[in-house]
Every structure is written in structure tokens, then in C-alpha cells.
Amino acid sequence: MSEDASADRRMLDRMIFFSDAVFAFALLLLAADIRLPTSIDDSTIWSQMATLAPHFASFLISFALASLWWAVHLSATRELRTFDWPTTLCNLFFLLWIVLLPFAADTFGANMMADAPLGLYWIVNAGASFSMTLMFFVMSRGGGRLIGGIGAGERLLRLTQAAAPGAVFALGAYWAFSGDIWLSRFCAMLLAPVMMALGVIAGMLKRRRAKAA
């Protein structure tokens, strides 16, 4: 391995390690926002816990979504063969939305029945989705020279997979700010079938490509 290639590999590893650290910190902050009062006794602890139910619900939803973003980020960066500054800048933009997730989750958990906090929550997650789409668009440019090559059809499918959650969340934000809070909540249930359908299509294309090879 040449000296330049070794330096590129170290920089790529640092980018990925930094990203994992940001995810770990964001997940820690999600739990750190759930606090009981400092002075409680045995007779009131369960009633106090009950008042935290919205925060726990927000934490569980946010943990699931943060795990989704980490898995998507892992899937994308594992294909990178060399360090690239445009990709790194897009990665930082993606991490900006991950860092904002604990703030959005805490706001949502404290005001779960209000429209605006839910809209804000969906906007942050839509930002994560669209910024990841931008990152993959940049890192797969030039025929995928940074990731070992990629066809136009597969690239389009991967970009659609990355952007699909953002479209669902943007729709949820629109409904939340329009006052249709129950339609906005329905967006969380839309996400799973959309991702599953795109995953099935991606699997079929990969098997077809493997047979052709």
C-alpha cells in the first residue's frame, strides 16, 4: 500500500470513528433527558414514573429511528474505498441532524399532544434522511469510483431508499403544521412498509446481478 493510500485509509477511518462517536453521544443524550425528581419517596415513585410515559415513548421512537440512521450510515460507509472531502462534508451535514435528534425528541416528549413539536420532530428526521441521500449521491458519483463501481439503476434505487423516509417525514411535518396531528402520527406506521418494499426490490436486483455475474 502506497503512503498516499495509507493516509487516505487513516482519514477514512477517522471519519467513520467520529461518526460512530456522534451517534453514541446522541443516543446517550436521548436517555439523559429522562429524569425523575430528585426528592421522591416509595409511595410516589410509580406515579412519578407514569408522568414520564410520554418521554419514554419519545425515547423509544427516537432510539429506533437513530438506530435506523446508524444502520443506513453503516451500510453506505462500509462501501467507501478511499477518503473524499465532498463526502466528508456531506457526512458532517448528516451528523448535524443526528445531533439535533435529542433536542427534537425532548421537545416532542414534553409536548406530545401538540402539533408544532411533532412537526419539528419530523423535520429533524426528514433532514437526516435527505442529507444521507445527498451523501450517497456525492459518494456514488463518477460511476461509483469511490465505492467500487455502481450501475445507474442500482444507484437510483439506493437514492430512492435513502430519500423515502424523508418523504414520509416531510409529509408528517406538513400534516402536523396543518393541524392534522393524527394523520401526522400515521407517518410512523407508513415508514415500515415503504422501507420493506424498497428492501425487497433491492434484494431482487442484487440477486439478479449476482446471477448475471
Task: Identify the meaning behind each predicted range.
Residues 2-213:
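Multi-pass alpha-helical transmembrane bundle typical of ion/small-solute transporters
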